[in-house]
Amino acid sequence: MGGRGAYSYSSGSRKRSSSAPLNAYAVASLNRGIAKGTSTEAAIGRFREQLMDAKVEYSAYIDDAGYVHALGSTGKEGSTKVAPISAVAKQRDVSTVIHNHPHGGSDGRKWGGPFSEADLAYIASAHGATGGRVNRIVATSNEGTYSARVKRSVSGGQVRSAAKRADAAVSGKKYQSELAMWRAVNSAYASEFGKIGIEITFTEQKKKRSRLVTQKTGTY
């Protein structure tokens, strides 16, 4: 995934590594509190809160019961590592891929921003590879949560054409702010991808943070 640089306020292309290990504690942290009950939307909320200020992208799968599986990251800005679908083959009802869109990194962006063509190509491919079982991709950001759901089989060519039309609708225009630009981009992508069977929605949300636990502590 990744590839959101087409409209970014770029101040450089260097990549910075994260020292946070991805281990059982990190996955358990994202599933914290599930004994009281959970859901897919609750899992999305936990993921957003715990990775709100991460400078690199993390990805995971969520099942329909609200459990997070297979957390992954390259630890570098501008790229994402998604575990292969085979990593969750034994998990029942895994239907959602989730990742965060960072802000405040070396690219200068203040907001996470919407889906890229690469994000949407990934979920279209995953939908086809799983016979429709994996059908949703979510991107969390400091401005809110983006969701894209594949309603029918979509080819790579259709994705590229839809992205090209959406990009043409917004490129070269001036915007009053970075956030206004991202809203316009999301609107264009939602319009064009809706025509080929990928439904894109956005829910604006306030910042809400909690800590991702990556190592054992005295109270964990």
Model regions and ranges:
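Active-site-proximal loop/helix of nucleotide/amide-processing enzymes and allied scaffolds
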Residues: 2-30, 80-220
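ATP-dependent kinase catalytic cores of phosphoinositide-metabolizing enzymes
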Residues: 27, 56-57
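Charged, amphipathic alpha-helical segments
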Residues: 31-49, 113-122
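Extended interaction regions within the primary functional domain
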Residues: 37-41, 70-72, 146-148
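A short catalytic or substrate-binding loop motif that flags glycine-/basic-rich loops and adjacent residues
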Residues: 51-55
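Short beta-strand scaffold segments in enzyme catalytic cores
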Residues: 57-64, 137-140
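Short glycine-rich, polar/acidic loop-and-turn segments at beta strand-coil junctions
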Residues: 65, 74-75, 99-101
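Structured interaction and signal-relay segments at domain junctions
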Residues: 69-81
